Structures are given as C-alpha cells and as structure tokens.
Curated annotation (Swiss-Prot):
This is Co-chaperonin GroES 1. The gene is groES1. Keywords: Chaperone, Cytoplasm. GO terms for molecular function: ATP binding; metal ion binding; protein folding chaperone; protein-folding chaperone binding; unfolded protein binding. One of its GO terms (biological process) is chaperone cofactor-dependent protein refolding.
Amino acid sequence: MATAKKINLRPLDDRVVVQPSEAEETTAGGIVLPDSAKEKPQRGTVVAVGPGKLLDSGNRGELSVSVGDVVIYGKYGGSEIEVDGHEMKILRESDILAKIG
C-alpha cells in the first residue's frame, strides 16, 4: 500500500481526498499483470478532509473519517485528479462505504 502523502489541497464541504492503494502487480497464481489489465483499487488512505456539510442550522456536520484512515469506496464514486504526480480521488463522504480498522 502506498504511504499517504501530505498534500496542499483543501476539499470543500463533505468531500474527502483519498490516495488509492496500489493496484495488484501479479495474480495469486504469479502472473504479472500489465497496466491495462489492472483493476482500479477501491481502497485508499484519506489525505485531506473538508470542514463538513453545511446544515440548515448554519453549523457544519462532522465527518466520520479523518486524515490517515483507510477506507473502501464505491467503484464509480468521486473524481480522479493528479496532485504532484500522484493519483488521488475526491469523494463525497457518502461515496465511502467503510472504514478499515
């Protein structure tokens, strides 16, 4: 798994920036996979979180994830971006399915 990198990016509202885990290089049988055959990971480390969704009361809703958490997210959720040569995903908190650990 890639080590989470500190980034200069502040997501808005209930958005979270996740650094995806590295895709598997080989299969369980030892076959080396080319980049075109690797499945995109659905797991990663949270590297930045927004301040929370603005509620009707004017307060901000607290996010249930924080920087350093390892999360599982939906396959088609979020937007892919590149920051300092690293692939990242910007997800809404609702795109995150589970927190590991």
